[in-house]
């Protein structure tokens, strides 16, 4: 909120926040069975809060600035095989994401091609949220 006066001084452009599918959906705890991994409540709460903050900010700094969020699905980063296999089996594209999978949607939201898009959260999750 302290930055709002600076943003209101005629800045133009796009802000793209990176949230998570766990800011939208609850965890599937069966994925974590037999692993040391977890899904902290604070992570889900902060990502859900970031999505709502993006909406709030879009209604506050528009029309000169657009604000959107991207919610990635699971990114392959050396997770245990059991987790990865269960995750991929539950994802329609049958794989976890790489960081490269998000560049297209971020570039779109940052560009003028999305000039009428603000206050949105786009899930990029290989279809995870389609079930």
Positions of predicted regions on the chain:
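Short-chain dehydrogenase/reductase
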Residues: 1, 54-55, 103-106, 110
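Catalytic loop of short-chain dehydrogenase/reductase
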Residues: 8-12, 16-62, 74-75
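Short, small/polar-rich loop/turn modules that mediate ligand/substrate recognition or access, typified
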Residues: 12, 62-66, 117-119
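Hydrophobic structural elements of the Rossmann-like NAD(P)H-binding subdomain
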Residues: 16, 67-70, 119, 124
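Short C-terminal tail/terminal secondary-structure segment
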Residues: 27, 34-36, 107, 118-131
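A glycine/serine/threonine-rich, flexible loop-to-helix segment
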Residues: 27-36, 69-91, 101, 131
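A conserved structural motif in NAD(P)-dependent oxidoreductases
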Residues: 91-102, 113
């Amino acid at each position: 909120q302290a930055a709002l006066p600076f943003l209101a001084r005629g800045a133009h452009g796009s802000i793209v926040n990176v949230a998570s599918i766990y800011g939208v959906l609850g965890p599937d705890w069966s994925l974590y069975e037999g692993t040391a991994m977890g899904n902290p409540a604070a992570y889900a709460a902060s990502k859900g809060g970031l999505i709502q903050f993006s909406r709030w900010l879009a209604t506050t700094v528009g029309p000169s600035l657009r604000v959107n969020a991207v919610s990635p699905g699971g990114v392959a980063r050396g997770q245990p095989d059991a987790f990865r296999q269960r995750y991929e089996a539950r994802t329609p594209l049958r794989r976890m994401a790489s960081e490269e999978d998000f560049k297209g949607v971020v570039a779109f939201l940052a560009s003028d091609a999305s000039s009428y898009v603000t206050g949105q959260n786009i899930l990029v999750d290989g279809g995870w949220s389609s079930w």
